[in-house]
Structure formats: structure tokens, C-alpha cells
């Protein structure tokens, strides 16, 4: 990815990200630098979220082709190798990390598919713009751009632009009777092979473009709420540079393990997980919000699945970070491994403390960032850091 100091200033404001500003530009706070590195790592899984947002911005005239390429008359004339185009896509891809975007996901997580369709229809009628996300049973997701909804008396047809199939109009069909949606992705002619899939409640959601307004509160700052209206929260972010791997978080709460890479997992109250949206049904990471008023203590381990088989992996390199209210940002780089009951990558206690311990058979590199302070420490196999 191409997220840098300039991007971060536009996303969160100079005061939140720049430790100082020199003749050469913004010198990032350590936490901002760590966050940007992790976000760029996650983009190896694709940039569909950024393309879906940019498509909506161009469609609604919130962005102009002339800002991307003065010579371009249509979006088809834009080059994927143009740095301005790449930077814009990466910039808007990053907004899925915003707490307001995550909170929109949380709200729509409780909607039935027909309720999502109705909300979208009403929003479009009132001039609101959205991106739409769909999720697979394998724990990954894809972002597309909706622009119309039609109800034929039996089903809703949501017309979308899918950046995987440029130049065509695709449709998501929602059946209110069964509360199921289906998407024959790529079907441009009847009977043609497709990459279609389907789902029910909690597998389709909307993000209002208003939730992506910039600048916003940074998730890595020392502010009291880090941009959340939910109050006392911890943000967990897990990413991987391995394009063949899907990574998430295994949370242990009151002795029970919840695997966020398994869409069938029913998460407890106070836990909200969203896969990062990449290319197709892919993406290299997950974002998890923990409401610490409901879940005061927990343990977190990185978990990885092979993208082609969905089998768990015990050798996948990953990066996981935790941002909690009023405490330093902690980032660990290690690899997945077998769990042991007395060891967790992150062990967050009721007092706001975090203990870091790599999985058995692995080492870890730990970074702690707080304001101007930045501390790095290697943790050997069998060791811990707090």
C-alpha cells in the first residue's frame, strides 16, 4: 500500500499524526507510523474497498476525473499504474478502519437482508450514497457499489457496480420470504459461468459514505474514545503480508474461544469483528472492536487459514496490534502456532495492561508506542513482555 504521512494527515489531521513538522514534511508519531505499516501490509489482499468507494465518489461527483488524470475522459481511460489513481484507491481503502465505518457494520449486522434493501432504497431516494459489503462462509468479504433498488413484488434487485467486472451492471437479488440474498457475480449473459454466492442475515451490510468523512479521530491516538461513540473500547487489528492466507483473531473470554475467521462463530455481546475487504472474497486481515465495559478482560491470538482450502495454519506470519483507551499502542509481529492454555499473544487485563507472549515454537518482535515514545523489544520463544 501507499499510505504515508501525507495520507495520514488528510485522514486524521496533522495534530493527531505529526510529532513535528520540518522542512522535509511531517515526522510521524511512532503509533501513526506503526499503524500505517500495518495498513499497507493488509492491502496485499486487494483493494476492492478503495475501488468501491472511489467508484461511488466519481458516480456522485464527489470526486472528479480531472483530479486523477486531466487527460482522462472516462474512468476506462484511467491507468492502474498512475500513482494518483493508486494513491486515491489506497486512501479510501483505509477508511474501512474508521471506527464510524465499523460502527455502521455493527448496526447493519442485526439487519435482515430485506431490511438492508429497504434501507438502501430509502437512502438512495433521499440522496445518500453507500458502499455495500457481502461476506462468505469462509470469513472473508467483498465491497461493491450499489446505485439502484427495484422491488418487483416478490424480490428486491439491487443494482451494483463490481470493480471485478468493469463495464457491466451486476445484481444482488434479495428474497424477503426466505431472508436470503444471492449474487451471480459476473453474469453478463444468460447461462454464462459465474462466481456466484449467497447468504442471509449478518452477511450483507451497508456503509454510508458519510461515515468515511475526513479528517476523523485516529484509532491509534491517546484520545479518550479514539473516535468511537461506544466509549471504552479496544481496537484489535490483525494483518498478514501473505496473499495466500486469511488471518483473524481467536479470542478467549471466560475460558471460551471465539474464532473470528469462522463466520459460523457466534460472538458474545461486546465483540464485533469485520474482515478487511480486499479483492473478490478475499482480504488479508480483520478488525475487531472489544467493548471493555462488557468484556473487561480477554486473550487474543492470531489465527490463519489457507485461502484455497480454508484449513488452519500453524506457520503463518502475521502482525497484530491493540489500541485501547488511554494506553499505549502495542504491536506484535510473530507467527501462528499451537495454543497453550497459559500463553496468549495478547492477554488484556481489567486494569488496561497487556501481556505479550509469542505462540510456542515462535519468537516475536514487539513495539510499544505512546506519544513521542517508541520502544522495540524482541521476545524469545517461551518469553513474554508486559
Regions found by a protein language model. Give the residues of each.
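Active-site-adjacent structural segments surrounding the nucleophilic cysteine of cysteine proteases
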Residues: 1-82
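Short, solvent-exposed linear motifs at loop/edge-of-secondary-structure regions
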Residues: 36-61, 143, 147-150, 243-259
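Conserved active-site-adjacent core of cysteine acyl-enzyme catalytic domains
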Residues: 54-55, 59-141, 163
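Extracellular glycoprotein-like low-complexity segments
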Residues: 218-386
Amino acid at each position: 500500500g501507499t499510505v504515508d504521512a501525507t495520507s495520514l494527515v488528510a485522514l486524521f489531521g496533522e495534530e493527531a499524526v505529526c510529532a513535528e513538522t520540518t522542512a522535509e514534511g511531517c515526522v510521524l508519531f511512532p503509533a501513526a507510523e506503526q499503524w500505517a505499516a500495518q495498513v499497507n501490509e493488509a492491502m496485499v489482499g486487494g483493494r476492492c474497498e478503495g475501488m468501491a468507494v472511489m467508484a461511488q465518489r466519481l458516480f456522485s461527483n464527489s470526486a472528479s476525473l480531472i483530479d486523477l488524470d486531466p487527460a482522462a475522459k472516462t474512468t476506462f481511460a484511467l491507468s492502474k499504474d498512475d500513482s494518483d489513481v493508486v494513491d486515491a484507491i489506497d486512501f479510501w481503502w483505509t477508511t474501512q478502519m474508521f471506527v464510524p465505518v465499523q460502527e455502521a457494520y455493527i448496526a447493519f449486522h442485526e439487519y435482515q437482508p430485506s431490511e438492508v434493501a429497504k434501507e438502501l432504497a430509502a437512502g438512495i431516494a433521499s440522496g445518500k450514497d453507500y458502499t455495500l459489503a457481502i461476506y462468505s462462509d469462509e470469513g472473508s468479504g467483498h465491497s461493491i457499489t450499489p446505485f439502484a433498488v427495484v422491488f418487483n413484488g416478490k424480490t428486491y434487485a439491487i443494482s451494483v457496480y463490481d470493480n471485478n467486472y468493469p463495464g457491466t451492471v451486476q445484481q444482488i437479488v434479495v428474497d424477503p420470504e426466505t431472508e436470503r440474498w444471492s449474487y451471480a457475480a459476473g453474469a453478463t449473459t444468460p447461462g454464462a459461468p459465474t462466481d456466484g454466492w449467497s447468504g442471509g442475515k449478518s452477511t450483507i451490510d451497508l456503509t454510508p459514505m458519510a461515515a468515511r468523512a475526513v479528517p476523523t479521530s485516529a484509532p491509534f491516538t491517546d484520545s479518550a474514545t479514539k473516535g468511537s461513540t461506544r466509549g471504552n473500547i479496544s481496537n484489535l487489528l490483525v494483518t498478514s503480508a501473505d496473499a495466500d492466507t486469511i488471518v483473524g483473531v481467536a479470542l478467549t473470554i471466560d475460558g471460551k474461544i471465539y474464532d473470528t475467521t469462522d463466520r459460523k462463530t457466534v460472538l458474545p455481546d461486546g465483540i464485533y469483528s469485520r474482515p478487511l475487504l480486499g479483492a473478490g472474497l478475499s482480504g488479508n486481515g480483520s478488525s475487531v472492536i472489544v467493548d471493555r465495559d462488557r468484556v473487561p478482560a480477554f486473550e487474543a491470538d492470531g489465527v490463519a487459514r489457507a485461502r484455497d482450502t480454508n484449513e488452519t495454519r500453524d506457520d503463518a506470519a502475521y502482525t497484530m496490534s491493540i489500541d485501547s483507551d488511554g494506553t499505549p499502542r502495542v504491536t506484535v509481529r510473530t507467527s501462528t502456532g499451537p495454543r497453550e492454555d497459559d500463553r496468549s499473544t495478547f492477554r488484556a487485563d481489567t486494569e488496561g495492561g497487556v501481556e505479550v507472549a509469542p505462540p510456542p515454537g515462535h519468537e516475536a518482535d514487539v513495539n510499544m508506542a505512546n506519544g513521542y515514545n517508541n520502544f522495540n523489544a524482541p521476545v524469545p520463544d517461551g518469553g513474554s513482555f508486559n
